[in-house]
Amino acid sequence: LRNLLKQDKERFAVPRGVQDVIPIKAIYDDGIFQVGRDKFSKTYKFSDINYAVASREDKEAMFLEYSELLNSLDSGATTKITINNRRLNRANFEKTILLPLKGDALDEYREEYNRMLLEKATGANAIIQEKYITISVCKKNVEEARNYFARVGADLIAHFGRLGSKCAELEPDERLRIFHDFYRAGEETEFRFDIKETRRKGHDFKDFICPDSMEFTGDYFKIGERYGRVLFLREYASYIKDSMVAEMTDLNRNLMMSIDVIPVPTDEAVREAESRLLGVETNATNWQRRQNANNNFSAQLPYDIEQQRKEMKEFLDDLTTRDQRMMFAVLTMVHTADTKEQLDNDTEALLTTARKHLCQFGVLKFQQLDGLNTAMPFGVRKIESFRTLTTESLAVFIPFRVQDICHTNGVYYGQNVISKNMIIADRRQLLNGNEFILGVSGGGKSFTAKGEVINQVLAGNADIIIIDPEREYSPLVRALGGEIINISATSPTHINAMDMNREYGDGANPVILKSEFIMSLCEQLIGGNNLGAVQKSIIDRCTASVYRTYQQNNYTGEVPTLQDFRAELLKQSEPEAQEIALAIELFTNGSLNTFAKHTNVNTNNRLICYDILDLGKQLMPIGMLVVLDSILNRITQNRAKGKNTFIFIDEIYLLFQHEYSANFLFTLWKRVRKYGAYATGITQNVDDLLQSHTARTMLANSEFIVMLNQASTDRLELAKLLNISDTQLSYITNVDAGHGLIKVGSSLVPFANKFPKNTKLYKLMTTKPGEGA
């Protein structure tokens, strides 16, 4: 340990320019920096996990796992854990999240949507929090350091993985960007660095990150026109809550908080603790001897000696029997502001937050430069205010708070309630991109679904298909230039149940798959009695026969209809064929023959809405089957073109009331992903939905679930199914419309989605009486 502390001491050279203030001596291609005579450092970035909203048991598990991580730190190296609040890079944000204008009629909506996104981005959440762990070690040369980091890095990544956090090493340009963004706040977009180019031209890498000027005074410093101050944790409370770090870094300013950890080898720690305990015991014995000399044989030991003895025994027990390690820790923090007045106010706010936790922060006097270099993730430590802690007491400074979801090219779903950051998610990046939107009536389900439809229509080139049983989507679909297909017995629009393209068969003969579909259809039409083997054979033979000409013409020309299929049945000699023909007559040549005619609507529009409000009870089961089959047709067609398809099914529980449509939907749910399609089920009747085993399986297998305000019985069912803690349940209990929980993969995040009311898009999305378009 003494050697390690000695290695941290370096001769102070008076900096002759701003470059000399930066303590990096050399940088290497793999992200290793030389930060001392023979000291090398490497930084890893790790993602946040849902600690703040986890249940008590989960928090304990995370705490113990984090303690394990601290225990695994090598005692021959110094570890620095840094939380960096950096300003949102506006240009990057605009490039990745704003919708590009396309010069068509929908541009007015794109501009409106972009205005809303910019308002959200420049509000309270203009700060992004990033977390790093920097390991620095003294080695003879960079090769030795490289081998060391390769070993330690793999271990570190595995430990973070067990916590549910992704950890990755930073490249040299990524590390330099951290310093550039801090030194040159407001110029984030101007960072350009190519290590090979720099080396070829003989440029100094420090020129790319250093500010124009730096000025250090007694208790603050100035970088360019900005002011900054470094604080350190002077006094620790006896009991600290695990939320302290999260609260300290909650300030909406550029700041960095670093915890330097120096693990002490356990044998040295035990020796030190034993000698301290021996000292306390000696004091106690001497005190007792003095009392005995005064004939005071019944005297009690003074409280302070008793307390010292108790604490030393506990400390020694921690080290020897409870698997704790002794650590030295230094906690430093640097924050910046535009004016001196603002800086003083921020300092006071931070000191007040610390006092709330009974800790005392102090301002570093005449050590601002050393403090700055310690707080930033260079891998150096110039501040000596050590505090001896055990693993457990150090783990209280847990750097985790809440997970943020920000995928590139994603859809905006609202703001994270805890971090106030935007939730931008892309279902295509998940293993299974199917989605459910659940919530009571008036909770904001349709609003959420419409928001997603709008984003997909305005942003990309994917096709969107909506099944609308309540006629809620018509104004939106019309405004976005989509096609509304009204389906009913009396409607002039028809969809041919036998429509089929060459991709329908998933690489095999499409007629085989279509034959299965027609069997389901006939079972449904005949009255739900299972078909016998003879009937199935007849249906299969007739299906192949009616499609023969269409297939021979290379899937061009006129597609056969159910009327052709019935005519083919009547040609067969078996009496069973005549029975089937008679049973389906009502739906082919009778008054419910809407699906037995050629399709006469444009099903090639990018945005299609199937309006099934007027579909009667008799037609509903067959209607749902035909619509779902028509969707499958479209999906397979799009797959061949390499195009995504998004399907939105409102009031999905209606489909589960009929066995065939439920099974067809289940198959669709499982298969659509490989076709590049993503299905969304929307319902308020979670209880009804979960009665169906099929629906239950679909919900459990969906990686993307938006839960809005829930009824009490539904809440309990969802908590059981998705393992939601009581803390998390509070976000879907009696909350306003548009508030709830969003499950993205393994992340569960509380969100709020407030859309500006004075916009055209709001009027198209809302279903509140009197507010709609």
Predicted segments, located by residue:
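Extended, folded cores of ATP/NTP-driven motor/assembly subunits in large transport
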Residues: L1-F400
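P-loop NTPase motor domains
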Residues: I49-N50, R56-S75, R86, T249, ...
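Hydrophobic anchor at the beta1->P-loop junction of P-loop NTPases
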Residues: I437
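Conserved lysine of the Walker
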Residues: K445
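Hydrophobic positions on the alpha1 helix immediately C-terminal to the Walker A/P-loop
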Residues: T448
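Post-Walker A helix-loop "phosphate-sensing" segment adjacent to the P-loop in P-loop NTPases
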Residues: N455-I465
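A short helix-turn-beta junction within AAA+ P-loop NTPase domains corresponding to the substrate/partner-engaging
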Residues: G481-I485, T694-M707
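Conserved P-loop NTPase
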Residues: L722-A773
